[in-house]
Amino acid sequence: MIRPVGAVVLGIGVMIALCAGVGMVWDQFAPDPSRPQGGAAELALSAIIVSTVGLIAFLYGNRFVSERISRREALLAVSLIWIAAGACGAIPFILGAGMSVDDAFFESVSGLTTTGATVIADIEGRLSRPLLLWRSLIQWLGGMGIVVLFVAVFPNLGAGGKHLFRGEVPGTTAEGLRPRIAETSFALWKLYGAFTIIEIALLKILGLDLFDAVCHAFTTMSTGGFSTLDSSVGGFDSAAVEYVIATFMLIGTVNYGLYYGLLRTGNWRS
């Protein structure tokens, strides 16, 4: 039960490092003087802290409990994963934006659960682009479910992975999507990613810069609603952009199991 939590925490550390690297490259080759500069170093430090904790839990967690996960343990593991993810996701806000622990945890949990509430009053003046990218990414990860991603990346859990998947995605759709849960998880994430890429392309065509297009596609597909602007999507002053974002928000509200069944068999009821 500890090992799955460690794996997800390790994965979050890798994602933070990715945001640090991408954000640093963005600032280097396409600087935006209107936004706070830097932030990559703070995210890199956050990534080191989170990855170290996750690696230790992943490598040594199975020494304290049975490696095989029962259904009851999986439900507890899913709960622990979300709590740990919220705590780890808050570290970049603490180090990169100087937020208090409670505000940072609120922002992180709001993002991961795609709630969309925020405690940041001055987004454009307070958050650097690496941190804005992280803030958008946590909504995208939470939109499909970090546990579903974990099961796809670590397919060797066997029955434990199946119980984790059902703990994250309960109901008849989770029971009958596909015999191999890891393949199902990977297929759902591929579909989710494809919709995201299409939206990024459309927003870029409509005139958004690549950074804003990526961030808003992340928060649109998850139906979370975080923005890189204080005035949100209205700041772009474009009806076409609003229609595209509204369309993909509607797409994001549909159960992805239905999309999967339609693509696989041509039948919604499958």
What kind of region is each of these model predictions?
Residues 1-270:
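Membrane-proximal intracellular helices of multi-pass ion channels
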